[in-house]
Amino acid sequence: MVHTTVYGLAYLFYSGINCILLYQLEIESKFYIRYQLIMRVQKETTDAFTLQLASKEVITSSIYNTFNNTNEHMYLQPICNRIFLMTSIIDIASFKAQVLFLNIFMIK
């Protein structure tokens, strides 16, 4: 009886530790994916602007093409919506302000 209780408690403790570690790993991987996404979006929008193609359609299609073969489609729509918001509020010539705006929205 005592052995069963000890083994049961040990198993529950072990299971709890595993759940906590898996949850922590999941959270860290989400933040890492989000960070990579921000970096790639910045690079794509910078490239588009450098080529004088910084219109809403070109930037968003560029981002869609970047993530076309990945599993990150669920992140694309909010990013594109934010870019539409940026380009309608901020003058497209002030590109530095747009990148800053994108960073502020993506970090939240």
Swiss-Prot record:
Record's keyword terms, sorted: Membrane, Transmembrane, Transmembrane helix
Cell compartment(s), UniProt: Membrane
Topology in membrane: Multi-pass membrane protein
One GO CC term on file: membrane
Transmembrane segments: 5-27, 83-105
Keyword Transmembrane helix: yes
Protein name per UniProt: Uncharacterized protein C27.05
Organism: Schizosaccharomyces pombe (strain 972 / ATCC 24843) (Fission yeast)
